Amino acid sequence: MFFYDWYVGLNDVIYDCIAILALGCAITCLLLILHRSALHRLHLVYADGSRRYCQFAAI
């Protein structure tokens, strides 16, 4: 009986770990996607700013 309880407890822990890992992966993926688009936007702004600066410096 003890072994059965231990097995069920272990299964609960494993399922909890899987759920936490899945949630963690989903959050990480979401953050990466958001971060990537934010980086892309930031890069566009930076590229635009540096282009203007170069034009200003060329005058």
UniProtKB/Swiss-Prot annotation:
It is a single-pass type III membrane protein. Its main location: membrane. Signal peptide: none annotated. Keywords: Membrane, Signal-anchor, Transmembrane, Transmembrane helix. The chain crosses the membrane at residues 13-33. The keyword Transport does not apply. It comes from the Viruses. It is found in: Membrane. Disruption phenotype: Knockout mutants displays reduced infectivity. GO terms for cellular component: membrane. This is Protein ORF5a.
